[in-house]
Regions:
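Short coil-to-helix segment of the ABC ATPase nucleotide-binding domain corresponding to the Q-loop/switch region
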Residues: 147-156
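Catalytic Walker B motif of ABC-type/P-loop ATPase nucleotide-binding domains
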Residues: 213-216
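The feature captures the beta-strand-to-loop junction immediately N-terminal to the Walker
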Residues: 86-88
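Conserved catalytic motifs of ABC-family nucleotide-binding domains
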Residues: 209
Length: 278
């Protein structure tokens, strides 16, 4: 764009016109505004952490034969992510899982779930937080064989005591439908296949809508086909419902499909790798 004006001689002035610059809304603004903007940007970029632990130490056994099972373990799980803990037998994987699940206590360090420090709660308060915030899946599903699939899923709801009888029935039916067992909710667990029983265990882990799911070899008793199906079911639930899943596994195929792999050795996490970078 050129500015066209008449000078005293009547000639046209072809000097390029200066463009009109609209100032950026933060340009020249007070430092506190700029700090607020940076803070808001960083907050958007930060992942939402569902569970974290810091400096977890655990000793097992009597004084004369104590084992240093965990040596300052730190970890964090973000919403919508699946984490695997791998390592040789006896390296501390299950001990860590039980401490994070508030089923055992650490000798030092802390655990935070949904921004609340929970590791130093006692008895009733600890049990309530465990039932509210955590879901568990074990290698052996521990279903009550004479209970129906629906009744097994309702067990954690009864323990928490937040729903009426009709609400518990409806919730259990909804969860069993989600894991593909809507047509078998009245079937006793002993009449279900191994893969179906594990799916009931997944539904039971979700009974109280936990923020975090902890799983100890959740597919260990299944054949490769059902193992993959069970893992893909968990993976889908975690992603769709923005939960966090930490599983202990010896299955390299399952581990490699997780978002993060944490390698343990002698009570330490010696390496953490995102998927595809191990």
């Amino acid at each position: 764009m050129r500015r066209i004006t008449k000078g005293s001689t009547g000639a046209l002035d072809n000097t390029p016109a200066m463009p009109h610059i609209v100032p950026h809304p933060y340009h020249g603004s007070p430092p506190e505004w700029q700090a607020l903007r940076v803070s808001a940007t960083l907050k958007i970029m930060e992942p939402e952490v569902s569970l974290s632990c810091e400096g977890i130490e655990r000793f097992l056994g009597e004084e004369d034969s104590r084992v240093h099972a965990l040596r300052g373990v730190s970890l964090q799980l973000e919403r919508g992510t699946v984490h695997a803990v791998v390592g040789p037998s006896g390296c501390g994987k299950s001990t860590l899982l039980y401490i994070l699940g508030l089923l055992d206590h650490a000798d030092s360090g802390w655990v935070t779930i949904e921004n609340e420090a929970v590791s130093h709660l006692v008895d009733d308060a600890l049990a309530r937080k465990r039932n509210e915030l955590l879901g568990f899946i074990f290698q052996f599903h521990f279903l009550l064989e004479d209970f129906t699939a629906q009744e097994n899923v309702m067990i954690p709801m009864r323990r928490l005591g937040a729903l009426s009888e009709s609400e518990m029935h409806a919730r259990a039916a909804q969860l069993l439908e989600a894991v593909g067992l809507g047509n078998k909710l009245k079937r006793p667990s002993r009449h279900l296949s191994g893969g179906e029983q594990q799916r009931v265990a997944v539904a039971r882990a979700l009974a109280n809508n936990p923020s975090v799911i902890l799983a100890d070899e959740p597919t260990g008793n299944l054949d490769s086909k059902n193992s993959r199906r069970a893992f893909e079911l968990l993976q889908r639930i975690v992603q769709e419902e923005r939960k966090a899943l930490l599983l202990v596994t010896h299955n390299p195929e399952i581990a490699e499909a997780c978002d993060w792999i944490h390698e343990m050795q002698d009570g330490l996490i010696v390496g953490s790798h995102p998927r595809g970078f191990r």
